[in-house]
Amino acid sequence: YYDMNFIYEIDEGAWLGEKIHAQAGTPGTNVHGEVVVAQRGRDIPLKYDRKSAYEIEEDGKTVIRSKISGVLEDYKGMVGVNHHLPVNGDVGVETGNIDFNGSISIRGTVQAGFSVIAKGDISIDGPEGVSGAKLIKSIDGDVFIRGGIFGLGETRVEAGGSIFVKHVNEANLVAGGDVNIGFYSLGSNIRAHSILVDE
């Protein structure tokens, strides 16, 4: 249950939808046996985010394709693709591990044994922080953990950029930039360009 693949990532150029153009209808007959002339269909424009998608004519249809890679987004009735993945709760049994080619914001926590990997920034906004998570890794960005890290000797946090955390307890942190700790670090291994503790 750790790898549930609940995220369906979309590649650049992927099919998002299509429209068949309005055509003339087929004439019918009413109850009196009289011919009823069909009206031509109305052509309705497609609604999509023009920053993340485009339309193209293919095989007599208007097809919407993605300009960027990311996750499918429905915003006010418009289809689009977003580089940002919001998780409105915890990463745990409901979501499985997350591996995303963009940035991630998590409103809750990352539960024990689960992992989050992102190409961009990772923000974990739950006040309780992280307890026993396996891996939190931002390949090119920063990691922001609003609460602290209770690593239980298991948690590893990696960032291509910097790591920002309230406190660290029994965890391993590796950053290409700085590690910024709000209060304290206890029983942890930390490697970074510089380590800043604000007491």
What are these regions (language model features)?
Residues Y1-D90, T95:
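Long, low-complexity, mixed-charge
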Residues V71-E199:
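Extended, compositionally simple hydrophobic/Ser/Thr-rich segments
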